[in-house]
């Protein structure tokens, strides 16, 4: 559309903004709202208004776990989601839309929530995604043959290869060491005033999106594995 418009994209990420931050790889994101940074409405609206004046449009990405300065989620509905007491989230983009429209910056604001799309879009994965997830499963399967391998999970540790490039290794540890723990997006990689992420962050992300797996299609539609409850 050629009319003035703000587009707000919501990604998964309750307590960490890795997914939201990775969208900056496209080079199209104007403003980024992460859980790691206390949300300040006045600063955010000021930046949206500035972008609209400069270019007539504004592309905002927000993590579902974005919080006010007092720790309250933008989108929490007050109900527990699971046994760990996590609040049910979803709707951060809608909240931002309401704030932007109510501030009179634009008459129209479009929202897109990626939660289910991100979970099911196997055609959008990178070759690195595919190979690492397969190898991770194999690693867990081989370890499970040992009786002592119980109550544990297998994870991926990032490192460097002999050539200094991207490399990973798999490791096992007790599930209790990881359950309900969060690895936040590094604060030193976050630019001020919602302006995105640093070049160091982009360098970290780039190896993860390399390669395009060959899709298996039937009648033009990517073939997917049916959920167990629908077989």
Task: Please place each PLM-identified region on the residue numbering.
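C-terminal non-catalytic interaction/assembly regions of soluble proteins
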Residues: 77-231
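Accessory alpha-helical/coil subdomains and C-terminal extensions
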Residues: 1-110
């Amino acid at each position: 559309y050629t009319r003035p418009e703000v587009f707000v994209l919501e990604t998964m990420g309750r307590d960490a903004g890795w997914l939201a931050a990775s969208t900056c790889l496209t080079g199209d994101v104007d403003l980024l709202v992460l859980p790691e940074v206390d949300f300040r409405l006045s600063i955010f609206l000021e930046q949206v208004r500035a972008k609209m004046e400069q270019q007539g449009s504004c592309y905002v990405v927000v993590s579902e776990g974005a919080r006010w300065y007092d720790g309250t989620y933008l989108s929490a509905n007050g109900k527990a989601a699971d046994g760990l007491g996590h609040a049910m989230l979803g709707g951060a983009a809608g909240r931002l839309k309401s704030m932007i429209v109510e501030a009179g910056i634009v008459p129209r604001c479009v929202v897109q929530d990626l939660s289910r799309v991100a979970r099911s879009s196997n055609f959008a994965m990178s070759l690195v995604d595919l190979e690492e997830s397969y190898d991770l499963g194999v690693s867990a399967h081989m370890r499970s043959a040992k009786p002592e391998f119980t109550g544990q999970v297998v994870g991926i540790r990032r490192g460097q290869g002999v050539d200094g490039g991207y490399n990973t290794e798999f490791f096992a540890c007790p599930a209790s060491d990881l359950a309900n723990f969060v690895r936040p997006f590094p604060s030193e990689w976050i630019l001020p005033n919602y302006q995105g992420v640093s070049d160091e962050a982009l360098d970290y992300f780039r190896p993860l999106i390399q390669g395009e797996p060959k899709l298996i299609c039937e009648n033009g539609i990517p073939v997917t594995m049916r959920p167990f409850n629908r077989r």
